[in-house]
């Protein structure tokens, strides 16, 4: 059954804000650094994937850099605020919290397929309901291999194409009251905040009209739809090639809509670091992304193709979406 709205919002805001207590300021730059990540897929794999980046930064900066996988984005923002973590890879909402609450500085934003933005994808195991015509095969590259997946309602594209949302949102009106929908986390931009506002704009209350599952990671949302636990799911575009399961994702999970464009994730550093160290961290990351080895590691970690200077003005759309959902009211 849908949860009570007040309890829903209180629990979300408790997760997002309660840990942001003030910590002691650092008098000088630390002797070693910690770079933090939060898994969008299986956490154990991420811990292994980030080690080459940490090793590179250690050499480039001339000081030990350790990688850490944290349990949630609020926890990572808190770690940045109190100086426990010094560099954080954050999603859009995490960057807003890092700037507005933790006093951190965003130094870079990710670029994928030449684009500084991305979007939510809506997918289903019931294409007869949500697809206006038969799904078509799209190929996606994963670990150098081309894999076929199904899309409909104009969401299909070449494997290296860069679609711009929104596309196919009229199909969301076919979601009936009581339908089970798999989101990822309550604080995820593409996994909850933006799809929830899109649904609300289509006349569907994501709290009272739906049976909601919070799957946790984006690949788990795909699995929930593939196994029939949910009829509709959401994730970043495209989480299907990153999903490891015995279920036949390629034949079962059909993408039928894209949400509006969202600014990409980025890198934030603790506000306690000196300007000189911040600049060195930024340059080291730019240099790493420009090497074949670094490009491969960043692609494995978060499908990052490059870094660019941050557009902090683009984050206002995140603040607006959070306000529309009533977080903190």
Where in the sequence are the language-model features?
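Extracytoplasmic "Venus flytrap"
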Residues: 30-50
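A local structural motif
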Residues: 58-69, 84, 146-160, 177-180, ...
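A conserved helix-loop-strand patch within extracytoplasmic ligand-binding domains
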Residues: 110-191, 202
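Bacterial N-terminal signal peptides
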Residues: 10-21
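Short helix-initiation/N-cap motifs at beta->coil->alpha
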Residues: 67-78, 91, 205-223, 261-263
């Amino acid at each position: 059954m849908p949860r009570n709205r007040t309890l829903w919002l209180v629990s979300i805001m408790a997760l997002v804000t309660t840990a942001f207590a003030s910590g002691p300021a650092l008098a000088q730059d630390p002797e070693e650094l910690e770079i933090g990540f939060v898994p969008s897929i299986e956490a154990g794999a991420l811990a292994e994937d980030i080690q080459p980046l940490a090793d590179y930064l250690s050499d480039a900066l001339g000081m030990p850099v350790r990688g850490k996988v944290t349990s949630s984005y609020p926890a990572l923002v808190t770690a940045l605020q109190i100086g426990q973590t010094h560099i954080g890879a954050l999603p859009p909402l995490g960057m807003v919290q890092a700037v507005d609450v933790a006093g951190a500085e965003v130094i870079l934003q990710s670029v994928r397929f030449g684009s500084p933005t991305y979007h939510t994808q809506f997918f289903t195991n019931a294409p007869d309901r949500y697809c206006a015509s038969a799904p078509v095969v799209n190929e996606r590259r994963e670990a150098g291999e081309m894999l076929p997946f199904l899309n409909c309602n104009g969401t299909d594209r070449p494997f290296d194409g860069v679609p711009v949302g929104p596309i196919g949102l009229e199909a969301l009106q076919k979601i009936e009251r009581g339908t089970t929908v798999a989101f990822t986390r309550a604080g995820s931009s593409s996994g909850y905040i933006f799809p929830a506002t899109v649904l609300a704009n289509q006349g569907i209350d994501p709290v009272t009209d739906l049976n909601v599952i919070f799957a946790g990671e984006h690949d788990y949302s795909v699995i929930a739809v593939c196994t029939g636990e949910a009829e509709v799911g959401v994730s970043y575009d495209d989480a299907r090639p990153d999903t490891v399961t015995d279920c036949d994702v390629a034949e079962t999970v059909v993408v039928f809509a894209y949400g509006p464009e969202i600014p990409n994730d980025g890198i934030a550093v603790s506000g306690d670091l000196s300007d000189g160290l911040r600049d060195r961290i930024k340059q080291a990351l730019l240099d790493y992304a420009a090497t074949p080895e670094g490009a491969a590691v960043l692609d494995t970690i978060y499908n990052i193709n490059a870094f660019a200077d941050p557009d902090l003005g683009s984050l206002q759309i995140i603040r607006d979406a959070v306000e529309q959902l009533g977080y903190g009211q």
